[in-house]
Amino acid sequence: MRKEKSLGLAAEMRKLAEASREAARALSHADPRRKDAALRAAAEAIGRRERRILSENARDVAAARAAGQNAAYLDRLKLDPKRLAGIAASLREIAGLRDPVGEVTASWRRPNGLEIRKVRIPLGVVLMVYEARPNVTVDAAALCLKSGNAAILRPGSDALRSSLALAEAFAEGLEKAGLPAASAQVVPTPDREATYELLALDDLIDLAIPRGGPSLIRAVAERSRVPVLKHYQGVCHLYLDASAPPQQAVDLALNGKVQRPGVCNATECLLVHRAAAGKLLPPVGRALADAGVELRCDPTALTILKRAGVAAVPARPDDFGKEFLDKILAVRVVADLDGALDHIARYGSLHTEAIVTRDLASARRFQREVDASAVMVNASTRFNDGGELGLGAEIGISTTKLHAFGPMGLAELTTQKFLVEGEGHVR
């Protein structure tokens, strides 16, 4: 019986991917105005369908809560009128961005007279595998459409109802613009085997992008025959250098940890220069503790905070290098900038790292030596985001260096081909 089910699912997923491949062919040369019209129509459809989308999302949230998911997880899953309006606004913003397809990135003339250009082209069919983030359904579909790619969207089972409801609104936009319905498809089953069947279709799917926790990333990378671009965990550090202004240190630590603790660019570890720890840790720790953050500290940091009357607990060995996605922060006092760089090299996840300092030499060295997709100087880790960096919406933040590194906007969803023109040239 299981074998029959597997064969049926395999055929179903192949059929879905074949439809995506056909849609990608049409999208590769679609009129940019038609793509933009589809995005604007989808934004309007989301507004009209708000009640249904929120109703389906409420069912998802209720089921996840009953299953024992934590508050940060539920926050990522939850939609409300404000967030839904933000999703619609994102569609309009993407519609207003410059279309990358056909952009000439370089051109030159060879001594033999050959004219050569490099131009951007779509990747083809993109499989997006993600967890409980309904907004990713729309962001990924929109970015893929704008960049001429077909999207296969595989949300986690907890977000399936929400994603299907959002996909209905997106499909309405496609239909109004006369674009293929298969340009953006949500995998309609929660069966995990469906993902594995799709990952085997390297003849139809050009790229897989997993976005979620370590277990999801590993499962996709290990099972995929399709090239994988990983959006791995964000173990983001904030380092307070010896010259860090105390109030700025407080502001950046609070923003990085508290604003949205359940996202990948939230700060997960605070490093403090030993020479300034006595001055910086008490006000920073107090502000974080007052905001409900549990501080898990190394012995030196714990002693300083306890003396200042700030609630803190000893760190466990695995707290360093951990993505908490919650109001929990690992805290360590380091000897100096070298110590901070060594710690980040050992525990960082290539995502986002930040320094607070008045010392230009320290700032430049931190920028030069830290290995991450974004390095912040006197700015919160929360700024590693496509919208905040001026890229428009993003499909995720890549921690894979090949092809794309950091927030993936429209340009990162294209590749390039050579156009060569001659006059009967032979070699």
Swiss-Prot record:
Q: Which GO terms describe its molecular function?
A: glutamate-5-semialdehyde dehydrogenase activity; NADP binding
Where located? Cytoplasm
Question: InterPro entries attached here?
Answer: Ald_DH/histidinol_DH (IPR016161), Ald_DH_C (IPR016163), Ald_DH_N (IPR016162), Aldehyde_DH_dom (IPR015590), G-glutamylP_reductase_CS (IPR020593), Glu-5-SA_DH (IPR012134), GPR_dom (IPR000965)
Under Pfam families, the record lists: Aldedh (PF00171)
Q: Give the protein's function.
A: Catalyzes the NADPH-dependent reduction of L-glutamate 5-phosphate into L-glutamate 5-semialdehyde and phosphate. The product spontaneously undergoes cyclization to form 1-pyrroline-5-carboxylate.
Family per record: Belongs to the gamma-glutamyl phosphate reductase family.
The name under which this protein is listed is Gamma-glutamyl phosphate reductase
Annotated source species: Anaeromyxobacter dehalogenans (strain 2CP-C)
